[in-house]
Design a protein with these regions (language model features):
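N-terminal signal peptide c-region/cleavage motif recognized by signal peptidases
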Residues: 17-21
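Secretory targeting signals
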Residues: 1, 13-15
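Extended rod-forming repeat segments used as scaffolds/tethers
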Residues: 15-16, 42
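Pocket-lining segment of extracytoplasmic ligand-binding domains
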Residues: 88-90, 171-175, 179-262
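N-terminal export leaders
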Residues: 3-7
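Short, glycine-/small- and polar/acidic-enriched structural segments
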Residues: 25-178, 182-189, 208-210, 215-216
C-alpha cells in the first residue's frame, strides 16, 4: 500500500472512530425499570431497544425487569432508576403517602388506558362473583397493582372481610392451584398464562376484570423522575418518540415483538 493511500485510509478510519466515540459520549444514559418480568408487554420496550431506535435517538437505555408497580415507583423516586413503567394507581398512592418526598415520579405517557388488573379464582372453588370473595383468602405480591387497588374493587362490589396473603411473584399462581389461597389479583394476561403453564385451562378460571366491575382506573404509564424531567426534557421526548415507533411496529408485526422478548 502506498504511503498516501495508507494515510488516507488511516484518516478515514480515525474519523469514523472519532464519530462513533462522539456519538457514544453524547448518548444520554437512561435506566428504565419495567413493572414486571420480561414477558409479552415487555415487547413494547424491548423492540425499540433491539431495533436501535433508542440508540438512534442518542439514548443509552438499560431495561431491567421489575417485581411490581409499587417497587418501580419507589426505585424511580429513590434515583436508582430514571424512568419506569408503573400502574398509575401505585404512583398516586406513593404521592398520597409521601407528600414531602423530594423526588416524586410523574407520569408522562399512558400505555394502558384501562387497568388490566383482575381478581381470578378457580371455578372449582365455587367463587363466581365478587360477592363470593367476602371472607375469602386472597393472594398477591405486596407490590401487585391489583392488590393495591383492591379496596376500590371491594367498595364497588360490597366485598368485606377479605384476608390477604403475600408471596413472591413466581408463587402466586402456584398457591392458587394448590388451594393455599382462594383467589388472586394480577394482570389478566400474566396470570392466565402462568396458570396455563401449571396445567389450568383458561375455561376453568373465573376472571373478574376491574374495569368491568366498577373500577375505572387508568392502567400503566411511563413515569420519570422530576430530576431528569427538569435537567433533560429532550431526552424524555426522544425516549417517548422511539417508544411510540416500537409500539407501532409491534402492533403491525406481533411476531417481531415476540422475537424481541425471546
Amino acid at each position: 500500500m502506498k504511503k498516501r493511500s495508507f494515510l488516507k485510509t488511516t484518516a478515514i478510519t480515525l474519523a469514523a472512530l472519532a464519530a462513533g466515540m462522539a456519538q457514544a459520549q453524547t448518548a444520554t444514559p437512561i435506566k428504565f425499570q419495567l413493572d414486571w418480568r420480561f414477558e409479552g408487554p415487555s415487547a413494547l420496550f424491548l423492540t425499540p431497544a433491539a431495533k436501535g431506535y433508542f440508540k438512534d435517538a442518542k439514548l443509552d437505555v438499560t431495561i431491567d425487569a421489575g417485581n411490581g408497580s409499587g417497587g418501580t415507583v419507589t426505585r424511580v423516586a429513590s434515583g436508582a432508576y430514571d424512568m419506569g413503567l408503573a400502574d398509575l394507581a401505585a404512583l398516586m398512592e406513593f404521592h398520597a403517602n409521601n407528600p414531602d418526598a423530594p423526588n416524586k415520579p410523574v407520569a408522562v405517557m399512558m400505555v394502558y388506558n384501562d387497568t388490566p388488573a383482575s381478581v381470578m379464582a378457580l371455578k372449582k372453588s365455587g367463587i363466581k362473583t365478587p360477592a363470593d370473595l367476602s371472607g375469602k383468602k386472597l393472594g398477591a405480591p405486596v407490590f401487585d397493582a391489583g392488590r393495591r387497588a383492591f379496596p376500590i374493587f371491594a367498595k364497588a362490589n360490597g366485598v368485606t372481610g377479605a384476608q390477604w396473603t403475600a408471596m413472591d411473584p413466581p408463587l402466586r399462581e402456584t398457591m392458587l392451584v394448590r388451594g393455599d389461597v382462594d383467589a388472586i389479583t394480577g394482570f389478566t394476561f400474566t396470570s392466565l398464562l402462568n396458570l396455563e403453564a401449571r396445567g389450568v385451562k383458561a375455561e376453568d378460571v373465573v376472571v373478574m376484570p376491574y374495569p368491568e366491575h366498577g373500577v375505572r382506573l387508568y392502567g400503566n404509564a411511563i413515569i420519570v423522575s422530576p430530576k431528569l424531567l427538569k435537567e433533560n426534557p429532550a431526552a424524555i421526548k426522544a425516549f417517548l418518540k422511539a417508544f411510540a415507533q416500537g409500539v407501532k411496529e409491534v402492533l403491525a408485526q406481533p411476531d417481531k415483538g415476540i422475537e424481541a422478548v425471546k
